[in-house]
Regions:
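Helix-loop-beta element that forms the nucleotide-linked donor phosphate-binding surface
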Residues: 169-187
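Aromatic- and Gly/Pro-rich donor/ligand-binding loops
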Residues: 2-156, 171-173, 188-189, 193-194, ...
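A short beta-strand/loop micro-motif in the catalytic core of glycosyltransferases
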Residues: 50, 158-165
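Metal-ion/cofactor- or nucleotide/acyl-coenzyme-handling active-site neighborhoods
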Residues: 41, 159, 183
Length: 205
């Protein structure tokens, strides 16, 4: 079954992969403030230390730059099943942040599907994708997925994607002409001292 899914376009893959979550939506049993909030909507749900370090750096950066805003975090494998609740809870003034790293493109279809879904679902919110590298395979599938990503990203005029290297920056500018692209080093470079990937505070699912 997984091999068959892997051959599908990312949008088809995601709808099948998360079919149960789309049908059986859940309400999050958490209390969030009425103040403006930062929603980290695709925190990694797996143990890769590099990606966990990036997630930690994102939290610390948000706390430092916007200390008065509450951070609410959902892991990437939980977003779809809480999507209806999120749509009813996230305010237009809230900021949505998405994971940095190297999962933008068609190499990691589950992550790309979740990212596209979030970006399209909140067209009026500022959405910030932290520094990413991009990869679309140099074949028909890669071209199709680049076009699908282009359409999804263009649906949100408040989207900003940060590229973490010059090659990715040029590629993103070419593939996503309607999206605001900026060049910025990997967010882990914003950390000082030793990174503890275990540290996590605030509200999360």
């Amino acid at each position: 079954m997984s091999r068959a899914l892997d051959r599908l376009a990312i949008n088809q893959y995601g709808k099948l992969r998360f079919a149960k979550e789309f049908i059986f939506q859940k309400n999050a049993d958490i209390n969030v403030s009425n103040e403006n909030r930062i929603w980290f909507l695709d925190a990694p749900a797996y143990g890769n230390l590099g990606d966990q370090a990036i997630a930690y750096a994102i939290r610390e950066f948000c706390r430092k730059v916007l200390p008065d805003m509450e951070i609410v975090e959902f892991q990437e494998d939980k977003v779809i099943q809480y999507l209806s609740w999120l749509k009813g809870t996230i305010k237009a003034e809230d900021i949505i942040v998405l994971q940095g790293g190297g999962n933008l493109g068609n190499l990691y279809p589950r992550y790309e599907f979740v990212r596209r879904t979030v970006i399209k679902s909140f067209p009026h919110n500022r959405v910030i994708v932290f520094p990413q590298s991009v990869y679309f395979s140099n074949d028909r599938t890669g071209k199709q997925e680049a076009a699908a990503a282009r359409e999804s990203y263009a649906a949100n005029k408040n989207l900003v994607i940060f590229a973490r290297d010059s090659c990715s920056f040029r590629e993103m500018e070419k593939e996503f002409p309607e999206t605001h692209i900026e060049l910025c080093p990997d967010i882990v470079f914003s950390l000082n001292g030793i990174v503890s990937v275990e540290k996590r505070s605030g509200i999360g699912v």
